[in-house]
Amino acid sequence: MRPLALLLATALCALSACAPVAPARRDVVVGLVGEPASVLADHPSARVVAAAVTEALVARDATDEFVPRLAEAVPTFDNGDLAINYEDADAPGGRLVATFRIRATARWQDGRAITAEDVRFAWDEDRSAPAGSEQRLVAERVERVEVVSERVVRIVYRANERWEGYPLAARVMPRHVLLGASADVRAAYARNPMHAGPFAVAAWLPGYGMTLAAFPEYVLGRPGLGRIEVRFFRDRSATLDALSRAEIDVAPSPVLEADLARILDRLADGTERARLLTYYSAAEAVETLRFGTRFGDQRVRRAIELTVDRQALVDSVFAGRARVPRSYLVPPVWAAIDLGIPPRPDREQARSLLAAAGYTAGNFGILERGAERLILTIAVAEGSVARVEAAQIVAGHLAAIGIAADVRVAPLREVETLVASGAHDLAVVPELARDPQLATERYVGRIGPWFDVLAIAARSAGEPAEARALYGELQRMHLEVVASLPLYQYLSVDVAPRSLGGVRPTPHLAPLTWNSAEWRFTSP
């Protein structure tokens, strides 16, 4: 029997060795919260889809470096495609000029070649985008776009400025589709855009999800996946449940937040036994407590800084994973500097400062000064459970020194408008820091004339070292007057299968799908 058993075992081994290896998966299922009105809508779910469907001439990668996409190369001084024109009489400080060369293989998803005219058309479109939108802000940094040839375009930037993000000004839109198009055609395009990304919308089932099919002629090569399935959920709890049941593979930021760290540590800890891996990324963004005009007294702002225990807030909401910043600029932003650790809470000193400002305890211990009582509202931008929880903790801390604060959640645009006008009491808002110029401009006119002068100087600084020194001084001035109170550095959370290669979250909060062409499963 033994020889027979040995023979059978040998045969089984041979058969298993000859058995075909199961192919790696070619599809992935992504879960999103909320169904957008269109792919190009201003909605978190839309941005995740749009990043897979659209493409730019140049993008920022996961290390914050510029990388060419539709362009052959990133224009630089070294390769001769970036220059400063000092011969323009209207720009005594010089004018930045960048030349972009479109790859010969760059195609729209309908097969048409992408041309320099498409770049100029996109700039024309962006100039009429809603005021305050990212497209409009970027377009306004450009003086003009010149078509040099079919595949070469020159971008001339605003006078007397140096913009670190200059390569991002070159976008494309299909001129042959949208030029002269009716409102209905444009609306249909926004819902289902034909662009140049690695995936195209193949199907959209309202109320359920979408199918994105790989674009085989994608400029950087055929995508590693053949299909991305998108599923829409009502809220993050439903998405988390689907993730735990393996009904979806990927939950990209901001679907889940770092306040779920304890749950995610059990579900997606990245160990061999876990199917999922959680990516935590310190983002170039800050959740900030902004002061309204009624807090014009620096002593009162300092008292609030000494009252709010930001480290305790971070420990409570994020299990200590997030960082408490001191500045409106945070690493890895190139202009961020180290301003030391935040001061420890000192509520006795806070009470002394408030007393020096004329406040005394009134009925129910609420501080008052003459007819003014410190009963106020903290406006909170919706869209983040963690942000609302943080605002509630701030309100609790303020109550300890006699400031009665009620938390009111409102749409982001509404809260941003309040902050811009100063008509709010206090507000908790997200503030992007990836562009130091734009981040600084939020505080122009609010700190002092010298701050405004330095902000202008930083925009036109010729050398990176000079610009960083100026931004460093701007951050010190912001800190000295307590222009705002940075509560915590935003910590983005992305969850994906351990076996899905190519997943690379970015610190600048690009949608996780920014490099979806590189995604591929490394095992069945």
Predicted feature residues:
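N-terminal lobe/hinge region of extracytoplasmic solute-binding protein
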Residues: 31-90, 192-195
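Detector for C-terminal structural segments
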Residues: 205-208, 214, 305-341, 346-351, ...
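Aromatic- and charge-enriched surface segment that lines or borders ligand/interaction sites
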Residues: 74-132, 154, 242, 296
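Extracellular/periplasmic solute-recognition and catalytic clefts
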Residues: 144, 202-211, 229-293, 311, ...
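Alpha-helical secondary-structure segments
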Residues: 29, 115-122, 150-156, 197-198, ...
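Ligand-site clamp/hinge motif
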Residues: 187, 216-263, 392-396, 402-406, ...
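Gly/Pro-rich hinge or "lid" segments in bacterial periplasmic/extracellular proteins
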Residues: 60-65, 139-140, 168-223, 227, ...
